[in-house]
Amino acid sequence: MNICFFGVGGVGGYYGTLVTRYCNDTGKGKTYFIARGRHKDAILEKGLLLKKDGGKEEIRVNPFFCSDTVDGLPVMDVVVVAVKGYDLKGATHEINKIVDGNSVILPLLNGADIYERIRQHLKKGYVLPACLYLGTHIESPGVIFQKGGSGQICIGKDPSFPEFYPERLLQLFKKAGILIDFFEDVNIEIWGKYMFIAPFALVTATYGKSIGEVAHDENLSVLVKNIMQEIASIAKALKIGLPSDIAETSFAKASQFPFETKTSFQRDVEVKGRQSEWDLLGGTVIRYAERFNLPANNTKATLDRLLQDVDKR
């Protein structure tokens, strides 16, 4: 099998390391990494190092190929897309060059409308809606650090090809030591996760507060809950079968994080000049609300304030 990891930052690097180790040990596949800058250079020089489970286990691998371009690559059996939301459109155009009708595309991004975003520009292959539970980041060029999360990937059917079952992908990832599960309706998992990350990301970034500070603030906690209700209304309009108490249970998850935890979106926003996934986390909600004529006043006001503050820097 030919497996491309398009983006080998925290997420792509974690799964890319595990799959590469399996392929190198068994000879049952080749991995191709698409990376950039000093990270790419470090991988070419000394391989990619994963510090798994907080550094308890270290795994170093050398992919079959690593470059910042797909030019000259063969058709891929699997493409794992692990870029930031703002790079997705450009990545999709490049991925078009290395897939055919039999390729499986697995997007591992935050967001509730990733499938639709990809299908706007990629008509070939099987695109599997997915979400994941993983806390990783690039510690230094060529080094990935896992700080939390089970690493579970939840995947579902391609709505355009509902009869397709990704047996080869599932077996490959499981043999590589990855926790991956197939769901008949993965949208419940995707929107359930989005229900937590989008409101907390927007509010923590806009007001410069940690997850714990937001959860314990009288006004900001109400704002988070209101945004959650707006997202729940959209999910209902999309006929996604979320539990009736999804907003309450999602908010309660904040207590599972250390009080001082910042969201990754918040950390991106705090770095002047760095791009962020504001459209993925806020713009999506506003567009869906407009489509279904639903209120999204809290989401819009929060996002507007955030973007105004960023523009002033």
Predicted feature descriptions by range:
Residues 187-212, 219-232, 258-259:
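Active-site-proximal catalytic alpha-helix in oxidoreductases
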Residues 99-102, 144-154, 205-214, 262-270:
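Helix-loop-beta segment of a Rossmann-like dinucleotide-binding subdomain
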